[in-house]
Amino acid sequence: MKKILLSVMAILAAVYMYAADVQVKVTYYSPEIVRIEKSAGAFHRTNSVSVIMEPQGTPAKPKVKVSVAKDGTVTFTDAKGRKLLTEGASSVEAITEGVDKGFWTVSQEFKLDSDEPIYGLGMLQNGKMNLRGENRRMIQSNTEDYTNFFQSIKGYGIFWDNYSPTTISDDGTIVKLASEVGDEIDYYFIYGGNADGVIAGIRQLTGEVPMLPLWTYGYHQSRERYKTGKELMDVVKGYRDAKVPLDGIIQDWQYWGNNYLWNAMEFLNEDFPNPKGWVEEVHNLGAHMSISIWQSFGPQTKPYRELKEKGLLFDFITWPQSGISHIWPPRRDYPSGVVCYDAYSAEARDIYWNNLKRLWDLDIDAWWMDSTDPDHTYREGDFDQMSAMGSLRSVRNIYPLMCVEGVYDHQRAESSDKRVFILTRSFFMGQQRTGANTWSGDTQSTWEDFRKQIPLCLNYTLTGAPQVNSDIGGFFPSGYNKPGQTQTCSTNPLFQELYVRWLQFGLFNPMMRSHGESSRREIWEFGKKGEPVYDAIEKAIRMRYKLLPYIYSTAWQVTSNHDSFMRALIMDFAADKKVWDIPDEFMFGRSLLVAPVTNALFTSTEERKWSEETVNWTKPAYTEVYLPAGADWYEWHSGKLLKGGQTVTAAAPIDRCPLYVKAGSIIPLGPDVQYAKEKPWNDLEVRIYGGANADFTFYDDEGDNYNYENGRYCTIDFKLRGRTLTIGRRNGSYSGMPAFRKFRLVYTDGKRTVTRNVEYSGTAVTINF
């Protein structure tokens, strides 16, 4: 079949081809990114919500080449002519009735190799790393959130730019994307050569990742819910008294009062009598306050009345359905009247922020935007409702992006003194640009659900969105309660073991956050100091704070260099086919290999039930870990050097998550602190792991404003070549920057360990070990 190679044509903004039944439009956005549009008629796609990049015209030397057959089928090759992907059949069928009349249902097939893994798609609770064979209708929900993007082990990615419910189907050779409403077929092919390159491309296309506040990388304590201001304050004081680090405290719902006042965005509950002073007291203890806000409103609230007057409320069933709180199942004879707002409307987003500003003026630090999916009990005809951007069907999946970006944009316009931080439950492509971290919804407190969180977080990261976490311990632990009682899960050894292992996984998430219903999660609920479970929890939290300089420096690489916190093994070791489908190991940053313990090793069962069994938490326990080929590995706790490409038996006592360091790594460790900003980073231990060359850029700034965007930060480059370490000249400065730093250098090569102390004033230093 004759094809035309578009990449050798003249440099144009776009190239149009006319096939038998469809027109094809090819637009280069960069040498690596090309947009394909197909239409049965004229091209009239409105502006993309996700894509913010402008096309650059057909490059003289594209890294991806496009050819179009007479029937409109597109093939992609790399610069050397190696085939990357070929389309299969496409379909653009007119919708002839209903509110979407005049639009089309659109679909496109892609021919993949049968043994070609793909990754991404958002948050799937399926426990799989390789997502071949998926067949599902993708629509945002509580525990599963989708973005129409996948990337291949071949180093390319596909972003299907459509916001309606979309079905992915895969018969083993054909992956098909089919959307219920669209202007046209519209997708982007991104060739990065590897996973990092694809992520760089999707962020260039849809938005870069801003820096989050330093404190957000500390430990967060939450519960469903703190019922009084005093109860929350007692938790913050309890951590300070126990000398266990804490940075974030989170206030869940109903600080506004009853369900008719749902999400009033003000403190109307008499159990929170002095919110301004309360927030100030939290700050005086070195902690930060996040607060729950929703995308729905009760009928007795100010925002409800304003939005209703403007016709900016939807009429579908959302949560809570009952006006009476704390009754399950809900009393539908007392309907709450709670409804979601039309976040697709710029005017509605203005109203939302103008009401949220009451909380902003209290000096709240961060927003917990719950139910951005949103919660929706579907009825026939709901998707026929009209939003400010068209039918709800046509834009359903970008609802979370509209909600979250609305708050981000308004806060950025309000002030540059406080970085935006949003914890949210749902996601769509582009949301990585909004200062948001997405959690995986209301998971069950089971080992099975815990195991699912690891590949979920990794596949989410492979969509280009690096900020992700889950409810440590799972949201629903009630099966562990003593029969007839509540708040007893934390005394149940079955839940204790699960909680500790989930916490150890959370230690290596971008956000370390404990949350759930039916049981208090504060450290003292699990025992007391000197007891194995308590000590294991404290050890994990303290290690998080030791790693803060490493984590924050990684955050800078995420912002400045398209990096990722949680790295699926295919990102660094794609040449090792054994890692292509490993769902329970990952890199945290570029240096740390994490292998969470995902099975019960100390208790007798993984069932969710009450147990009073006596557990020997000190007995030896072991698990198997695969060390990827392509590197040697140091065991974190012992320093033992191991070869890659083998499975090893790792010690896994209750207070230890198997952890390895890639040979050729530099890891800065911070001081012992009670909160992230308690002490400056002027006295650090720096661990240097030899056996390969190493590069690391240490980053520091003012911690919680946007001055870094204007160059107010500093970086220090560490380079290891053989046994010689060079600490480069300090680049940049910021207000409050230490003029001098002490570095305690600890070098190991598996045979010997050498320690050096360096007084660093900002000029380059060379050290030989």
Summary of predicted features, one role per range:
Residues 57-213, 223-224, 229, 236-241, ...:
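Catalytic and substrate-binding clefts that recognize carbohydrates or anionic sugar/phosphate headgroups
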Residues 26, 36-38, 63, 74-76, ...:
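Short, well-ordered beta-strand segments enriched in hydrophobic/aromatic residues
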Residues 45-55, 80-96, 734-751:
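Extended Gly/Ser/Thr-rich low-complexity repeat segments
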Residues 234-254:
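Catalytic domains of carbohydrate-active enzymes, especially glycoside hydrolases
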Residues 27-64, 92-97:
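A low-complexity, Ser/Thr/Gly/Pro-enriched, surface-exposed linker/loop concept
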Residues 408-420, 427-439, 460-470, 475-724, ...:
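Catalytic core of carbohydrate-active enzymes
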Residues 1-21:
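Bacterial Sec-dependent N-terminal signal peptides
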Residues 87, 98, 247-537, 572-574:
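Aromatic- and carboxylate-enriched substrate-binding clefts and catalytic-loop regions
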